[in-house]
């Protein structure tokens, strides 16, 4: 819904009232999407995005580093299938990423709960592509078990899911006894 698309100008880069996290979905023939979120532990604010097609590792690393420097990103969650890129970013560019938890249905449910409870808001000025992707995400009615459709909308949506779901699960793990 459009009520989730707002001006998030009040969230400033490096504002320590928030933790800044990111999700990275890598598309070797499809688009790469890097999303930046601010969270206070309850709400998630999508504050920035970088979208590219067929980008070299060096260009992608440069763009990610700019976002890390600008926002003060604490954690980057990457598609666990992208191990070569994860290694290249770490060894060649000193950009460290954590493997995302890829529990697709649970991750989608976590994002859906945030949206339904107005706890996921998207910056109208900086994140139009990701907003459109989230709004266009579809399930494949032809599969026996529910699976999302792999199309243009899935990459940004996956990056959001990686960031939110993995961060939620890891944060809970910190306090687990």
Segments predicted by a language model, with ranges:
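Residue-level detector of short, conserved catalytic/binding motifs and their immediate flanks
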Residues: 32, 74, 157
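Short beta-strand scaffold segments in enzyme catalytic cores
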Residues: 32-38, 161
